[in-house]
Regions:
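Transmembrane-helix boundary motif in ABC transporter permease subunits
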Residues: 2-8, 77-109, 126-129, 165, ...
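Transmembrane alpha-helices
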Residues: 18, 23-30, 146, 153-165, ...
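Membrane-interfacial helix termini and adjacent extracytoplasmic/periplasmic loops
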Residues: 4, 44, 48, 53, ...
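Hydrophobic alpha-helical transmembrane segments of multipass integral membrane proteins
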Residues: 66, 70, 74-86, 90, ...
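C-terminal transmembrane helix and the adjacent membrane-cytosol boundary/short C-terminal tail
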Residues: 2-17, 101, 157-168, 172, ...
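Interhelical loop and adjacent transmembrane-helix boundary motif
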Residues: 5-12, 41, 56-67, 206-256, ...
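Loop-to-helix entry region at the N-terminal start of transmembrane alpha-helices
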Residues: 67-74, 126-151, 155, 191-193, ...
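Short membrane-interfacial helix/loop motifs at transmembrane-helix boundaries
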Residues: 28-63, 213-218, 270
């Protein structure tokens, strides 16, 4: 036993070291951006010569940046509503339904996760150009829904599969209609999973660049498009502050989603 431990010891150390190196490689850019965002210098520098909030003040004090936050929030909220409703209906059909071609339909619904986003963006651009709808919040929200829907379906399908169907069957046996059982039994119990999926849809939209890059207009720009345009024209530490803001939003949303998923698993007993 001791010899086995000695033989496996170096392997375990190597795996842990490799995992730590990968984790550091992934986290280091984020940490650097956050630190640079507090720099008081007039240019991007790491480590910063001294700390200051001046770039956050410029970010939040510039009307164009604030407008981009509002546009991103509006698009993300619409995307969240569209993707959540469509994803819930699709998940119910895929999990509960018995019909031919269910696997093919499921594959088609998840295809936006496989197809390169640039191809999806180009297709959406030509579609909305024909409708003369580019540059609108609705067009960007519909485009983001295409990307968010697969994520929502995966989360909701997993939630429904973990739901004890006997609870709904008991309600039906007591005279409740399917709609009533769904509304008063199923939905309250899977609500944490639904909210978690909705948050992921919001985050998918809020962080997306390529689709709004094709569909946004001169006056209607999301925060990510505004960052891109600023990087093309000029680079100053304001970009680091904006990026840190996005990192903060992502962290909060992911934390809330993880909390809701934990509550959902407790409620469904999975």
């Amino acid at each position: 036993m001791a010899e086995d431990g000695q033989r496996t010891g170096p392997g375990v150390v190597a795996v842990v070291a490799l995992a730590g190196a990968v984790l550091l490689f992934l986290i280091a850019p984020v940490v650097i951006i956050v630190i640079v965002s507090f720099s008081g210098a007039d240019y991007l520098s790491f480590p910063p010569p001294f700390l200051s909030l001046r770039w956050y003040q410029r970010f939040l004090g510039t009307p164009s940046w604030r407008q981009s936050i509002v546009v991103s929030a509006q698009v993300a909220l619409l995307t969240m509503v569209f993707a959540t409703v469509l994803g819930l209906l699709a998940s119910l059909a895929l999990v509960r339904g018995r019909f031919r071609g269910k696997g093919a339909i499921y594959a088609v619904l998840l295809s936006p996760m496989i197809v390169p986003t640039i191809i999806t963006a180009i297709g959406l651009y030509f579609f909305f150009v024909r409708l003369k709808a580019t540059g609108s919040i609705l067009a960007m929200a519909l485009g983001h829904t295409v990307l968010a829907l697969p994520v929502v379906i995966i989360i909701m399908a997993a939630t429904l599969q973990g739901f004890d169907i006997r609870l709904e069957q008991a309600a039906l046996s007591l005279g409740a209609s399917r709609v009533t059982a769904l509304r008063r039994i199923t939905l309250p119990l899977i609500l944490p999973g639904v909210l978690s999926a909705a948050l992921f849809a919001f985050l998918t939209s809020f962080d997306e660049l390529l689709i709004p890059l094709f569909l946004s207009g001169v006056e209607v720009q999301t925060l990510t498009v505004r960052i891109w345009n600023s990087l093309v024209l000029e680079v100053d530490p304001t970009i680091a502050a904006v990026s840190s803001f996005l990192i903060g939003v992502t962290t909060v949303v992911l934390g809330a989603s993880a909390f809701l998923r934990g509550r959902g698993e407790s409620a469904t007993g999975t």
